[in-house]
A protein has these predicted regions:
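Conserved catalytic neighborhood of penicillin-recognizing serine enzymes
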Residues: 67-122, 165, 169, 181-194
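Periplasmic/cell-envelope proteins involved in peptidoglycan metabolism and beta-lactam response
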Residues: 1-47, 51-52, 68, 120-127, ...
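Secondary-structure transition/capping motifs at alpha-helix termini
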Residues: 17, 32-33, 62-71, 133-136, ...
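Active-site-proximal helix/loop microenvironment
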Residues: 132-186
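Primarily short, surface-exposed interaction patches in extracytoplasmic proteins
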Residues: 32, 69-70, 98-99, 116, ...
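Acidic/histidine-enriched alpha-helical segments
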Residues: 7-15, 73-78, 173-184
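Active-site SXXK
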Residues: 19-20, 39-73, 101, 156-163
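Flexible glycine/proline-enriched surface loops and loop-helix/loop-strand junctions
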Residues: 37-43, 94-96, 103-110, 138-145
């Protein structure tokens, strides 16, 4: 980050898949650097996760059987409650399968899937599971599919740990003797591994 003309900052969190053990945690690239707000721990700051929750949305939809692995979406412009979402490149591919919709990060397919799941249901489930450390969680509605649910990178890391842990929620472990608590699965192992 030092090579950029404009002051920028960066943060990184690396955790082991099975144990959640944190192997690297850097919340800022320069604590003393005021020009880049170095004293802010960006791993604890809420940010838009962009499209990173799409796998969770599709997994929940697979679990609830509102879509299937061979699902085909109609990737086209839509209007939802006066809102006209679009894909990031403003292009549409017509009929597209689930795998390609996820790989291409298609917003229309994710929003339509979240409509089928019910964003209220998924937000409530997510809140119960991942928001135990305090801090409010705003309602994102269908914008949850495109980054509207603000999370810390730590919360996002725990979301991906859960998916890597066959759907069972896992906490980041900042101590080497940390053991995962026994919890029931958030999503099924089959959906987590699809």
């Amino acid at each position: 980050v030092d090579g950029y003309q404009v002051p920028i900052n960066g943060a990184i969190l690396i955790a082991e898949r099975g144990s959640g053990a944190v192997r690297a945690y850097v919340g800022s690239s320069g604590y003393q650097d005021r020009s880049r707000k170095g004293a802010v721990n960006y791993l604890m700051a809420k940010r838009s996760p962009g499209s990173t929750l799409k796998p969770l949305i599709y997994a929940e939809a697979l679990d609830r059987r509102v879509i299937s692995v061979d699902q085909v979406f109609d990737d086209r412009p839509i209007l939802v409650d006066g809102y006209r979402p679009s894909n990031f490149n403003n292009e549409y591919d017509g009929r597209i399968g689930l795998k390609q919709a996820l790989l291409s990060s298609k917003n229309i397919a994710a929003i339509e899937t979240l409509q089928k799941v019910g964003y209220e249901h998924l937000e409530a489930k997510y809140r119960r599971t991942f928001q135990s450390r305090g801090g409010g969680m705003e309602t994102a509605g269908l914008a949850m599919a495109v980054g509207g649910l603000y999370l810390t990178p730590e919360e996002l890391a725990e979301t991906y740990l859960m998916m890597a842990n066959d759907g069972v929620p896992a906490s980041l472990a900042f101590e080497t003797d940390h053991q995962l608590d026994e919890q029931s699965a958030f999503i099924t192992a089959g959906a987590a591994n699809s």
